[in-house]
């Protein structure tokens, strides 16, 4: 289908990839906990934008460049790790009792989730190594193949994010 070797397997692989706990999932939960459904969905859109950025960078050959120059990939990994440590330290330094209630706008959570996704080594590896496995060279249709894959990933991420955000919001509402 559109040059994708096994579309069903591709969909299953993306769903499994989404379900693996990681920084993106935590960003969705954190945004929902801090700002409700709007902020959680903004974070979901940030994850989607980050995924789309990585996907299209992989398509444009950046992934081959990073594979050729492992130091560049390692630098991205370190930048991502430092960013996640900084976010964690910031969270740990804030005591809930003493912290003033911040009115963070949804765009804050969008940006945060975007950078978490773009700097996440798991996502980078997915698009560099795993993603090309589903492209059928004999039936490849150029950008159409990648556009279908990109749209599928975006739709599945949106659906997954919606489930996570609404579930987290409902659980939080039951606690109060």
Give residue spans per PLM region.
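Short alpha-helical functional segments enriched in proximate histidine and acidic residues
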Residues: 52, 56, 117, 158
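Selective transmembrane alpha-helices of multi-pass membrane proteins
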Residues: 68-96, 154-164, 168, 172-175
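Selected transmembrane alpha-helices and immediately adjacent juxtamembrane segments
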Residues: 121-122
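Flexible cytoplasmic inter-helical loops of multi-pass small-molecule transporters
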Residues: 93-109
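Juxtamembrane transmembrane-helix termini in multi-pass membrane transport proteins
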Residues: 2-74, 129-153, 165-168
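A short amphipathic helical element positioned immediately N-terminal to and/or at the very start
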Residues: 110-118
